[in-house]
From Swiss-Prot:
HAMAP family: Endoribonucl_YbeY (MF_00009). This is Endoribonuclease YbeY. Its cofactor is Zn(2+). The keyword Nuclease applies. Belongs to the endoribonuclease YbeY family. It comes from Marinomonas sp. (strain MWYL1). It holds the Pfam family YbeY. Its main location: cytoplasm. Zn(2+) binds at H114, H118, H124. The gene is ybeY. InterPro entries: MetalPrtase_cat_dom_sf_prd, YbeY.
Amino acid sequence: MAYLELDLQIATEETANLPSEADFRLWVEKALPEVDEEFEVTIRIVDEEESHALNHEYRGKDKPTNVLSFPFEAPPGLELPLLGDLVICAQIVAKEAAEQNKELFHHWAHMTIHGILHLRGYDHINDDEADEMESIETELLASLSISDPYLIKE
């Protein structure tokens, strides 16, 4: 089983309805490979202003976003257990959950797992990659008794 060193940073004043550190730990561990290795992950919960600034600087997108993933790339020959950093915008996650008629807690789980899969190298740039990533997310969420986040709810 993977060993996780989790650094949870709360950098938003809106802390109502945030998941606990134990929740984040569970979701991250679900998305890690089942290997006997150590992983270090930072999750930073931010406001829309910080999300917007980071999304603009690193992705060229002039708006806040739900989750940003920053994989750690060690220099050649250096092996460290750092997987990377996730930056999750609390306000965007809450807005999306409301707009998509999803339970807020479930959407937090989805965004965390989605971000960890990005840190592990998964992506959704093309349809095949998106299908694979969505399938893994759906399976991991189902193991937590969370329904398929890609099903449209009326």
